[in-house]
């Protein structure tokens, strides 16, 4: 089980990403705009750098919803490989069964 502080830190990052998503998208649009002047692009770059570091979506980590484990997490289920296997063996995941050939 992951430390509670790590899970809370990840939740904080998720909130920050949601809070600054529109602002980041607008600034990135200005930076990548061909028609924008160099001064506008430079100011947008400085404003983007001034935003909180954790407001970037690339700083988020997929974690297991049950244990908080950061590695081996299946996006489709939101569970780590260990908990997904346990749930599949119990029959809790509809349509998922053990492979046999």
UniProtKB/Swiss-Prot annotation:
GO biological process terms held by the UniProt record: translation
Alphabetized InterPro entries for the sequence: Ribosomal_uS14 (IPR001209), Ribosomal_uS14_bac/plastid (IPR023036), Ribosomal_uS14_CS (IPR018271)
Question: What keywords is this UniProt entry annotated with?
Answer: Ribonucleoprotein, Ribosomal protein, RNA-binding, rRNA-binding
Instruction: Answer whether the UniProt record assigns the keyword Ribonucleoprotein to this protein.
Output: yes
Q: Does the keyword Nucleus apply?
A: no
Provide the leader sequence positions.
Answer: none
Q: Which GO terms describe its cellular component?
A: cytoplasm; small ribosomal subunit
Question: Could you state a single Gene Ontology molecular function term?
Answer: rRNA binding
* Family under the similarity heading: Belongs to the universal ribosomal protein uS14 family.
Subunit-structure text: Part of the 30S ribosomal subunit. Contacts proteins S3 and S10.
Tell me the function of this protein: Binds 16S rRNA, required for the assembly of 30S particles and may also be responsible for determining the conformation of the 16S rRNA at the A site.
Name the chain's protein.
Answer: Small ribosomal subunit protein uS14
List the gene name.
rpsN
